[in-house]
Amino acid sequence: MFSRSILILTFCLLLGGSVTAQDPPLPTASPTPFATDKNGIPPEKVGPVPPVNPFYRSNERDIPELSRVGVDMAEQKPLTLDGAIIMALENNRDIEVSRKNVRIAEFDLLAARGVYEPRFTGQLYYERSTVPNVSIFSSNQTTTQSTLVGNTALSAYVPNFGTQVQATFNNQRLTTDNPISILSPQLNASLGFSVTQPLLRGRSMDPQRRTIEIAKRNLSLSDAQFRQKAIEVVTAVERAYWDLVYALRNLGVQKDGVRDAKEQLEHNRRLVDEGQLAPIDIVAAETQVANYEGAVYDALNLVNVAENALKNIVSPHRRDDIWEQAITPVDEVRVEVPTVSLDQAMVTAFANRPELDLNKVQKDINEVDRRYYNSQRKPQIDLIASYNSAGIGGTPNPNFDPNFPTPCTVNPSSPECQQQLANLQLLTGSPYSGVFTNKYPTYRVGIQFNLPMFGDKTARAQYGRALVEGEKINTQREALEQAIQVDVRNALQVVKTAESRLRFASIARENSDKQYESERRKLDNGQSDIYRVLERQTALTAARSNELRAQTELNKAIADLERAMGNSLKANGVDSKVK
């Protein structure tokens, strides 16, 4: 049995050797040559390089002053977020422009309504004329006539139905040397009333009412634009405020890093003195201190940029005292995260977003235009009615001398002469007795029309344009609603992501702190080296900064969520009324 086992083992070894002998030999690895150009010249030998300032050396120099440009650090200005928002709304130039636009819209509406104020017009003049005599009944070569005219009128539009009313009161005093004029001076007076009522075009909507309705909508438009700008400014203030909070706290973290690095440097020196570390390990610690000191200046620059951004929003002008002050945010970094579902956020956004209000106002203006241009397509047919009462008076002409016989020149005692004198008596005296006793009335009722021969192409085109404009506004609203939906969904997701980042950043900071302390203990016990300690120290500083960044980013995400829901003003207790 043992012999058979040996034979089988020998056979297997021989078979394996034959199979191995049949396999092709593996290629041997050859080193990859360094790159050369087509002439075989390696990069380090390419061409002569001209010397440029070959003797430059970076010499030691004084460290720049640790301060912010143009800021007196002794002039501290504590500032809350609410205080910054109030300053921005009061001083921001864009807000002031929006506020002025609202006032302008108010005056535009007031001016548009002025069309319904009654208009009192009149004229008063004296005229003297001399003309040649062309009448066979007068022997004078010329006739001189003096006229004194005083006319007044009161006209107005009725707010409804496009009605126009007018009242006139005319007066005239005429003096002449014409011998055939019965009266000199002659007094003429009249009192008239007229009404023009559109029956088709202009009855439901006329230019005056269109102007007023559009002015009303423009006022709402300006108010919505003001709220939109206020929301933008409030959000910008919140973001700038939290950026400054992070920058200042990050500056503190970097200063703590310098302190820890210097403590580690002193600790390493003691270990070198004790013989546990080589002297060269002190160099690494000194480099760490220098790196952290440079990080302090970088953090200070970040503070300066963030502070200037906030000052630019809240300051009224470039010469304000705040530019020389150091802003100190005093609000708590932790902000309560709003608990709102997607459906609730969408309902709030659709109710509060000023963009939708702007679109609605534009739609209302378009509806006014549609009504107006639809009215303009109709034929212009107006009902007109007028009443006029006239009167005449004066004094008999003392120079009356007709060149033809009259009943009084033929027979002064005849009935005809008596009737003529009676008629003359009716003409003398005050003209107003005839005016107010309706002695000489005139009545008129009729219609007037203005019909285009081949249809009003202009009105039809304007009405068609208004219809298309309405369709465009509806399409824009659909796009706005979809964009708002995306904005709200993204804002909610960013808040959730920021919450998770804050949690993970806090865990990372705690663990980095533990790892750093553990690595220091290992170094003291000879179980680690200085480089791992410095690595843990750098990681701890970065974790502290990341935790602060995560907290402020969460605050900014909450501000963006309030903006997306159109709730920034209410959330910060801001009244959007224009003062």
Model-inferred region functions:
Residues V97-K100, R113, N160-N188, R201-A224, ...:
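Sec/SRP-type N-terminal targeting helices
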Residues A112, A224-Q344, V494, A498, ...:
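Periplasmic alpha-helical coiled-coil/stalk elements that build and connect Gram-negative outer-membrane
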